[in-house]
Amino acid sequence: MFDGIGFMELLLIGVLGLVVLGPERLPVAVRSVTGWIRAMKRMANSVKEELEQELKIEQLHADLKKAESKGLSNLSPELKESIEQLKQAAQSVNRPYQVQDSSSQGTAAPDNQIHSPAQVSQTNPTTPLETSQHLTSPAAHNEPSQGVDTSSNPKANG
């Protein structure tokens, strides 16, 4: 991993880190640096695996094209094997979609329907204005308060 860095250079970096960061912060700094290095390694490995997988798929595709051009009768065993692998991969990709299509064709959920605003308003004819009129009585708003004179009370006026 440390190509070109010898033991003496690593020792010098460690001593400088100890002097600059101190004994309390050096372990935390080392842990964070090693965490970054691990994350970069994981990312590089995942990219490498994805590229290898894509190259394998491209190779299978090229083998299939080669087999089509030669004709399927006189193929080498390698090409027959790669054709079988490609067919199996295509079937495994199609299986989840076939299961999903067959289950969704049998039943249609009524909850998934979209209603127009007219349909919704016909089911619930009460408007917010009507409900507020039912909750408050008009007599409560028209009656003056009896027995309390608020004109002489300064706190009630303002």
From Swiss-Prot:
Region (Disordered): 86-158
Polar residues composition-biased segments: 88-107, 113-136, 143-158
InterPro entries reported in the protein's UniProt record: TatA/B/E, TatB
GO MF, one annotated term: protein transmembrane transporter activity
Keywords: Cell inner membrane, Cell membrane, Membrane, Protein transport, Translocation, Transmembrane, Transmembrane helix, Transport
Positions in coiled-coil regions: none
Single biological process term from Gene Ontology: protein transport by the Tat complex
Keyword Magnesium applies: no
Membrane topology according to the record: Single-pass membrane protein
Pfam families, per database record: TatA_B_E (PF02416)
Subcellular compartments: Cell inner membrane
GO cellular component: TAT protein transport complex
Primary role: Part of the twin-arginine translocation (Tat) system that transports large folded proteins containing a characteristic twin-arginine motif in their signal peptide across membranes. Together with TatC, TatB is part of a receptor directly interacting with Tat signal peptides. TatB may form an oligomeric binding site that transiently accommodates folded Tat precursor proteins before their translocation.
SUBUNIT field: The Tat system comprises two distinct complexes: a TatABC complex, containing multiple copies of TatA, TatB and TatC subunits, and a separate TatA complex, containing only TatA subunits. Substrates initially bind to the TatABC complex, which probably triggers association of the separate TatA complex to form the active translocon.
Family (UniProt): Belongs to the TatB family.
HAMAP family tied to this protein: TatB
Name this protein carries in UniProt: Sec-independent protein translocase protein TatB
Source lineage: Bacteria, Pseudomonadati, Pseudomonadota, Gammaproteobacteria, Alteromonadales
